[in-house]
Structure formats: structure tokens, C-alpha cells
Amino acid sequence: MYELTGKVAIVTGAAAGLGQAIAATFAKQGAKVVPTDRPGVSMDETIEMCKKAGVEEVYTHDLDVTDQDSIAKAIADVKEKYGSIDILASNAGLNRPMPLDQVTPEVWDSVMNVNLRGAFFMAQAVAPVMKAQGKGRIIFTSSQAGLVARENQQPYCASKG
């Protein structure tokens, strides 16, 4: 098992669900967790879970994975605060279930922008930091939806496959 004590871990999409669980698990294992989510989304529950897991300080950051300026700012701020970034858990995801005949180009693009482009641009932004450090881990959250079609989830399934 990879030792997490003292490691700096950015978790995207951490306000709820799997991202929240990842952040709390990393915190329990001693990581310096940086839970992130879209601006305006409450991180209070995630902060509480991380503190219950044993960390004293939880540094959260607003981060819109569809905005490269937001990504660059988050990476720079975390690097400035902690001096390194050891782990990126790229978990942010969007699903907009609806019948196929109702999926507009805007719906399709919104899902792809978060699930594909966001994951790619996060990795692209953090990779130079990790390369300069000579170490780092990038973890992408996938889904069985990428392997098994689900009714009314065409864009999501395509983005996870």
C-alpha cells in the first residue's frame, strides 16, 4: 500500500459522494488533503469528515475543472502552501440523465467538459509539478457506466468508457 502520511493530495469533486469519501479516506491515512469543488459549493461536510478522520487543518479550494485559469490558480496555491503536490485524485464528474432524443449539443458538451476535458487539463497542469519533484500519482475515477450502457445516460457513459 502507498504510504499517505504527510502526502499532499488534491481531490476534485470532493463536496459530496465519492470525492468526499476519497478525501476522508486520504485524511484518515495521514495525507494533507485539499478537497476541491466548484465555486459556491459548500465543503463544510467534507471538512468535518476530514477532521473526524484525524487532520487538524483542511485546506479547501474552489476549482472549476472546466476553466484552465481556475485549475492553474488551484495548482499554484496548493504548491505555494505545501511546497509539493503528491497526489491528484481526479474525481469531478457530471451526469445529466435524460432520454437520448433530448440530449442537446450543450448537454453533451457540459458532460464532456467536466468528465474528459477537466480530467485531462487537471493532469496536464499538475504533471510538471510532479515531474519537477521526481514523484507523484494521478488517479482518475472511472465508472462501470463506461463498460455497460445505462438508460438515459449516453453522454456520461461515453465519457467514462
Range-by-range predicted roles:
Residues 40-41, 62-73, 105:
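The beta1-alpha1 cofactor-binding region of Rossmann-like NAD(H)/NADP(H)-dependent oxidoreductases
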Residues 101, 148-154:
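Active-site loop immediately N-terminal to the catalytic Tyr-X3-Lys motif
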Residues 143:
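Residue(s) in the substrate-gating loop at a strand-loop-helix junction
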Residues 8, 15-17:
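Conserved glycine-rich cofactor-binding loop
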Residues 123, 159:
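Active-site helix of classical SDR
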Residues 29-45:
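Conserved glycine-rich Rossmann-like NAD(P)H-binding loop of the short-chain dehydrogenase/reductase
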Residues 99-100, 107-109:
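Substrate-binding pocket helix/loop in short-chain dehydrogenase/reductase
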